[in-house]
Amino acid sequence: YTLLCYKTPSPINAETCPPGENLCYTKMWCDAWCSSRGKVVELGCAATCPSKKPYEEVTCCSTDKCNPHPKQRPD
């Protein structure tokens, strides 16, 4: 069984994760354009939940397509 996760960069598609990567993650942080564009969002697959830096928000989940882009409607 392989997991389906959304992956950035655009276009954001759900892709099959490589074997051994059984988590989807969403990572968000502010860059220089945060006030006009909002947070940067990175999506992908992981074997273990990525460690969170002080300025990041990181969430992980383990079901298919459980990490949609916050601004994207789930399909």
Swiss-Prot record:
Subcellular location as annotated: Secreted
Annotated PROSITE patterns: SNAKE_TOXIN (PS00272)
UniProt keyword list: Acetylcholine receptor inhibiting toxin, Disulfide bond, Ion channel impairing toxin, Neurotoxin, Postsynaptic neurotoxin, Secreted, Signal, Toxin
Cysteine disulfide links: 5-24, 17-45, 30-34, 49-60, 61-66
Keyword Nuclease: no
SUPFAM superfamilies: Snake toxin-like
Molecular function terms from GO: acetylcholine receptor inhibitor activity; ion channel regulator activity; toxin activity
One Gene Ontology term, aspect cellular component: extracellular region
Expression by tissue: Expressed by the venom gland.
Protein name as annotated: Alpha-elapitoxin-Bc2c
The species this protein was found in: Bungarus candidus
